[in-house]
């Protein structure tokens, strides 16, 4: 059993993840066989979490071989089996030759675990499990046999599997219709850091950085711990970002392509969709995506959109005011920044520093800040004192006509208490001063929105901005103000 001292030590070494650590501890201390799946976006810190929470508790652990550098598909199964065999040798396997099939490999693992079984809890950890399942390898049937035929009959076994290919994890484990149906005893999804957790991370690393720049780092790196780990103390946000993404030897060289190849079997189709979604903040319909990318509208496109959504790169939502039709919107900040700026400017080692005050970067900040707000709805609701009110978020786009100007609202909070928060998001380096022209635009949006509401509903014009509002003659209609400090709660 993990002691209280051990748990406190683990929690102090990991930013956030309190619930996840407690859940892994509960599973470790149970008196029955446990089969837990841990999944989440690549680079989000799944492996680090597991290895810290269960430090020194592993009986056997193995990591699948990344497909990124395996060009020869015919040898992928052989490579995976060879790597698995070496892991077993490192853990004490003796008297067996390299297996030629996964059924043979798991039989050898069973023999090894029986040899190592002391009656205490045995933790068996497979990292990047989806990588092990190569085409025509019959891996899954052998893995099913390993759990159903061996692990499940031993009360001291805790099987932990981890994977970045979220769709594979969900389809083959969580929603399995085969031999693993209903076999998971728990599943844990690991999410990116919130802004508050990013701040805690930088403090832990003794990196001095303002909240304004933490928000900017979130706009680029999306709260992914692995990316933040490349920040260096003593450098500005601009300099750090240039070193991580730009120049001849950036720390995340070719990360976009490697990211997609590591997760998706149809990575080229996935990247086509991402590049399209970058071009319009509120997203595209399925039909528009098919038309623009040339991908057929059949089941293949539906499957690709589904795996992108399950992997948290895109989200599907119903635009406000539309009874039919769903939109797909990009929600991965890193992909947005990479496609917009890194791909075209990677050789410029000082791109961020050179363009920091340019109109190009200002336009990006506007879109990226809206993304950050979507990702921190909980914090915004808390600031608006509606944490207990059921609410959904949406966007609204109304094309203009010859008679009437259109409008676009990127963030609506539609509440069950008959109030709709129309959120204006402004990322500024100082307090926001509403001009006469901007007030007119805001009021136009409010009036158009009111036309769609019932008589019992009210619109609250809400400003989400960096450093608050300059109260003047054009700001009176704003009901609530949310600052970036509020996003850190």
Where are these regions (language model features)?
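A cross-kingdom feature that marks ATP-driven nucleic-acid transaction machinery
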Residues: 320, 326-489
């Amino acid at each position: 059993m993990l002691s209280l001292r051990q748990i406190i030590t683990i929690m102090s070494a990991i930013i956030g993840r309190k619930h996840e650590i407690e859940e892994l501890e509960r599973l470790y201390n149970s008196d029955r066989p446990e089969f837990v799946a841990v999944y989440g976006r690549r680079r989000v810190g799944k492996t680090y979490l597991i290895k810290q929470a269960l430090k020194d508790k592993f009986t056997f652990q193995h990591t699948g071989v990344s497909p990124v550098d395996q060009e020869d598909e015919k040898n992928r199964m052989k490579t995976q089996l060879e790597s698995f065999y070496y892991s077993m040798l490192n853990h004490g396997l003796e008297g067996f030759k390299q297996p030629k099939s996964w059924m043979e490999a798991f039989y050898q693992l069973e023999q090894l675990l029986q040899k190592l079984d002391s009656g205490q809890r045995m933790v068996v950890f497979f990292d990047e499990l989806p990588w092990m399942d190569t085409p025509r390898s019959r891996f899954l049937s052998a893995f099913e046999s390993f759990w159903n035929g061996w692990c499940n009959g031993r009360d001291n076994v805790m099987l932990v599997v981890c994977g970045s290919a979220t769709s594979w994890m969900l389809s083959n484990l969580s929603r399995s219709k085969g031999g693993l149906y209903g076999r998971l005893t728990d599943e844990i999804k690991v999410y990116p850091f919130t802004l508050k957790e990013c701040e805690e991370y930088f403090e832990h690393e003794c990196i001095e950085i303002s909240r304004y720049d933490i928000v900017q780092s979130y706009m680029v790196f999306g709260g992914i711990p692995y990316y933040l780990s490349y920040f260096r103390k003593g450098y500005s946000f601009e300099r750090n970002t240039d070193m991580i993404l730009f120049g001849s030897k950036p720390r995340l060289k070719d990360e976009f392509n490697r990211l997609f190849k590591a997760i998706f079997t149809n990575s080229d189709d996935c990247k086509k969709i991402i590049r399209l979604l970058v071009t319009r903040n509120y997203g595209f319909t399925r039909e528009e995506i098919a038309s623009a990318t040339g991908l057929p509208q059949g089941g293949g496109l539906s499957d690709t959109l589904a795996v992108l959504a399950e992997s948290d790169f895109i989200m599907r939502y119903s635009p406000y005011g539309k009874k039919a039709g769903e939109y797909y919107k990009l929600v991965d900040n890193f992909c947005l920044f990479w496609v917009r700026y890194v791909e075209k400017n990677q050789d410029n080692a000082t791109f961020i520093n050179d363009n920091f005050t340019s109109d190009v970067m200002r336009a990006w900040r506007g879109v990226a800040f809206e993304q950050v707000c979507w990702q921190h709805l909980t914090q915004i609701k808390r600031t608006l004192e509606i944490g207990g009110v059921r609410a959904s978020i949406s966007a609204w786009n109304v094309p203009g006509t010859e008679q009437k100007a259109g409008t676009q609202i990127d963030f609506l909070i539609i509440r069950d208490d008959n109030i709709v928060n129309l959120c204006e998001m402004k990322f500024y380096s100082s307090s926001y001063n509403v001009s006469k022209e901007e007030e007119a635009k805001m009021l136009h949006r409010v009036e158009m929105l009111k036309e769609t509401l019932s008589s019992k509903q009210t619109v609250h014009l809400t400003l989400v901005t960096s450093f608050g509002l300059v109260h003047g003659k054009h700001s009176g209609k704003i009901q609530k103000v949310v600052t970036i400090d509020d996003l850190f709660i």
